[in-house]
Amino acid sequence: MSEYKYCVGIMSGTSLDGIDVALCKIRGSGLDTDVKLIDCQTYPYPTNLLCDIKKSLDLSTSNAQLLCSLNFKLGIEYANAVKKLVAANNLNLKDIAFIASHGQTIYHQANNERGFIKSSLQLGDAATIAYECQTTVVSNFRAGDIAAGGDGAPLVPYVDYLLYRDKDKSRALHNIGGIANTTIIPKNANIDDIYAFDTGPGNMMINRSMEVLFNQDYDKGGDTAAAGIVIVDMLQELLDNPYLKQKPPKSTGRELFGINYTDKIIAKYKQNKPEDIVHTLTIFTAQSIVRAYKDFVFNKNKLDQIIFTGGGAYNKFLIKTISDLLDVEVLTFEDIGESSDAKEAIAFAVLGNETLNKSYNNIPSATGAKSRVILGQINFF
């Protein structure tokens, strides 16, 4: 097998909780991929940049000038994050073979409707990152899948298959970021056996309620939710969301479960205690995940374990609620000796490596694409 090379994966998700940057060593490709995490850090967005991102997400405050400028501001910020992590590990930028950057999702149009076609926009100019870091950058991963008729999401299942398949255990890898998504990997699977989809909201609605009601970024450990009780009418309204009944492959985003929707729910039930609203949103998130397994997975596959990753894996109340509702072993990434925070940044490093090796790196059964394609666009340096 080839020698290890240093690479960096960058992920900034819909939770807007910062820039996850993973410094890795990688060699091989495809089923022979061998990747080792050296270090991963999350760098918070500067306040003014976070403000610009939030403006760009709201149709009432977004505009072309803002998006144009933000694209390059994010490129500079991502490059600065890479420089910090590389220096902290006593390496030089010239040691880095490539960077793979997902970018900051601004809008994800999952369906053709009202004259709009399937599309997805991630900002964070790759040419700027390449110039600032003096290395090759792979970016814009979702476009290739959308061009092939897919949703452009979820993309991480390909990496889940490469790194976490098992000949004896059927498992699901479930990421709880802003949106929650699952990858189903039957035991002894080949790539055509894999399927994946977005189950619904992850941290998105919980985080927004904490911001509005408690002026906090998130519910640490789920402590606020644990102090509340269910608002029955509110929970039923949330569970009636049509997305939960939609069959996979499917994907969603803040367009459906973001600020506008969450704020309407909070306003409608504002006469209730704040902790009860957070509790109910957390129960809804848990039940949307559980329903996804009961409606779309268990009738096809008997799972031995579900492994949770992402920021939501640290919400103890959320994970316990899910575990109590499922008759299957529930683990977090930390339980298997890995980092929930680092998983998606590592995944995009692997996807970038596949791109540079000219390997197909989408899974049509997950995204709905007509065929397998090579994802990512390359800025050589």
UniProtKB/Swiss-Prot annotation:
Give me the reactions it catalyses.
1,6-anhydro-N-acetyl-beta-muramate + ATP + H2O = N-acetyl-D-muramate 6-phosphate + ADP + H(+)
- EC number(s) in its UniProt entry? 2.7.1.170
Which pathway does the protein contribute to? Amino-sugar metabolism; 1,6-anhydro-N-acetylmuramate degradation; Cell wall biogenesis; peptidoglycan recycling
Sequence positions that bind ATP: G13, T14, S15, L16, D17, G18, I19, D20
Q: List, in alphabetical order, the Gene Ontology terms for molecular function in this entry.
A: ATP binding; kinase activity; phosphotransferase activity, alcohol group as acceptor
UniProt-listed GO biological process terms:
1,6-anhydro-N-acetyl-beta-muramic acid catabolic process; amino sugar metabolic process; peptidoglycan turnover
Q: What class of enzyme is it?
A: transferase
Task: Give the record's keywords alphabetically.
Answer: ATP-binding, Carbohydrate metabolism, Kinase, Nucleotide-binding, Transferase
Pfam families, per the entry: AnmK (PF03702)
Q: Which residues form a coiled coil?
A: none
| SUPFAM superfamilies assigned to the protein according to its UniProt record, in alphabetical order | Actin-like ATPase domain
Cited function: Catalyzes the specific phosphorylation of 1,6-anhydro-N-acetylmuramic acid (anhMurNAc) with the simultaneous cleavage of the 1,6-anhydro ring, generating MurNAc-6-P. Is required for the utilization of anhMurNAc either imported from the medium or derived from its own cell wall murein, and thus plays a role in cell wall recycling.
| UniProt cross-references to HAMAP family, sorted A to Z | AnhMurNAc_kinase
Q: Which PANTHER family does this UniProt record tie to the protein? A: ANHYDRO-N-ACETYLMURAMIC ACID KINASE (PTHR30605:SF0)
Query: Any idea what this protein is called?
Result: Anhydro-N-acetylmuramic acid kinase
Question: Which species does the entry assign this protein to?
Answer: Francisella tularensis subsp. novicida (strain U112)
